[in-house]
């Protein structure tokens, strides 16, 4: 009988969710709707890609070593955790009163060209006016709110994967 919650199937689920999320962002929101991603959106995508990369390695190579599985899990969790934190900050910026919204600044490309990485991170998390605007909603949720829900589901999936990694192996019943 096929178990949907096996280690490999859960990793494949993460890879599929990464592909769907990135495809939705790139093809629908950017190409079809014409939205340019703000710096916080770009950082969320980076986190999703990191998670997807580690999950892809785990799904393809299906390591037997618990240490390797835990390292891949930790890398994947770090990626999606990063994305969730950034999405949470993004949602917070969108719910600020209008008089507290930061002003628009130069784009991420300019910051990367002129500032050290530590300062770039500070500027991105400070937010800008473009990060606080709500351009599109679905079911009453903005894009960052939808992303935060997806990232929360993926974090719960990571907890299930951790359980699959560390749970003691159950002995198989003896054949009669």
Curated annotation (Swiss-Prot):
Its main location: membrane. GO terms for molecular function: electron transfer activity; protein-disulfide reductase activity. One of its GO terms (cellular component) is plasma membrane. HAMAP family: DsbB. Required for disulfide bond formation in some periplasmic proteins. Acts by oxidizing the DsbA protein. PANTHER family: DISULFIDE BOND FORMATION PROTEIN B. Residues 29-46, 89-145 are periplasmic. InterPro entries: DiS_bond_form_DsbB/BdbC, Disulphide_bond_form_DsbB, DsbB, DsbB-like_sf. The chain crosses the membrane at residues 12-28, 47-63, 71-88, 146-164. The keyword Cell division does not apply. It is found in: Cell inner membrane. It is a multi-pass membrane protein. GO terms for biological process: protein folding. Residues 1-11, 64-70, 165-176 are cytoplasmic. This is Disulfide bond formation protein B. Coiled coil: none annotated. Keywords: Cell inner membrane, Cell membrane, Chaperone, Disulfide bond, Electron transport, Membrane, Oxidoreductase, Redox-active center, Transmembrane, Transmembrane helix, Transport. Disulfide bonds join 38-41, 104-131. It comes from Psychrobacter cryohalolentis (strain ATCC BAA-1226 / DSM 17306 / VKM B-2378 / K5). It comes from the Bacteria.
């Amino acid at each position: 009988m096929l178990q949907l919650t096996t280690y490999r199937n859960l990793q494949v689920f993460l890879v599929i969710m990464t592909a769907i999320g990135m495809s939705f962002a790139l093809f629908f929101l950017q190409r079809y709707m014409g939205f340019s991603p703000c710096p916080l959106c770009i950082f969320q995508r980076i986190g999703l890609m990191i998670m997807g990369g580690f999950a892809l390695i785990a799904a393809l190579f299906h390591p037997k070593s618990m240490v390797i599985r835990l390292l891949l899990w930790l890398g994947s969790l770090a990626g999606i955790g990063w994305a969730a934190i950034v999405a949470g900050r993004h949602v917070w910026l969108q719910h600020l009163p209008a008089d507290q919204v930061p002003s628009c600044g130069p784009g991420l490309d300019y910051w990367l060209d002129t500032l050290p990485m530590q300062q770039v991170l500070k500027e991105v998390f400070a937010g800008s006016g473009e990060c606080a605007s709500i351009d599109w909603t679905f079911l009453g949720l903005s894009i960052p709110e939808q992303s935060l829900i997806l990232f929360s589901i993926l974090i719960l999936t990571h907890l299930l994967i951790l359980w699959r990694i560390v749970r003691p192996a159950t002995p198989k019943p003896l054949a009669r």
